[in-house]
Amino acid sequence: MSHQWADCERAFIAARYDRIAGLIGFIDWLFFVPRHFRAHAVKRLGLRPGQRVLEIGCGTGRNFPYLRAAVGPQGRIYGVDLSDGMLAKARALCGRERWTNIELAQEDAAEYMAPEPLDAVLFGLSYNTMPHHLAVLHHALKQLRPGGRIVIMDGKVPSGLGGKFILPFGLWLMRHTMLGNPLIKPWQHLAAVADHFEMEQFVFGSWYVCWGSKPTGAQMGALPYASERLIAAE
């Protein structure tokens, strides 16, 4: 489905997030982001000390405390974001906390290459804000080790009359803040290319965490066709 913000240029998206970088805490409150949502999503990554994780759309680093606790000081965290304003706040956070194992990059996530194979990838409230989300997901899969896990945490429109009632306001609010599209179905995209897919919903279906693993062994042959499978799921 096409929406008026789906063709936003990178510069426009980056500029919008530069402007709202100081408001992310307020926006979490405005959208009723569940209190333990971020910690729960990171838990679903199944990270162990010393592992390597990439957060796509890392923003101001609000997930970094949970990621750092999971991988420890010997692990490695990579964060990529289009917005310099967001990354400036993330760098400041890392400086205050003296986290030296977090590497940040201002780049399109569909082009960013982590310097080493990844154990896990997190889309932290970012998947539905990227017009080219399918390309980003496919690119993330290529960087993930076999058996590595991808987690997508995001918001969606609840089913039923409640969802229909709040949809017009939700779309208006997204256009004026995060530029996201809550009508896409990332869980279908991930389920099309991942093993052991699971999904949980929160706050009457307004928020979800879904996860799955990159296929291993004999199933690896399916991965060259991931692009086609993703398009079919769209």
Task: Describe the function of each predicted region.
Residues 2-46, 62-66, 89, 166-173:
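Conserved class I S-adenosyl-L-methionine
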Residues 8-11, 30-31, 151-208:
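C-terminal alpha-helical "lid/dimerization" subdomain adjacent to the S-adenosyl-L-methionine
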Residues 54-56, 60-111:
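Class I SAM-dependent methyltransferase SAM/SAH-binding core
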Residues 110-121:
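A short acidic, Gly/Pro-enriched loop at the edge of an enzyme's catalytic core
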Residues 195-234:
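Core SAM-dependent methyltransferase catalytic element
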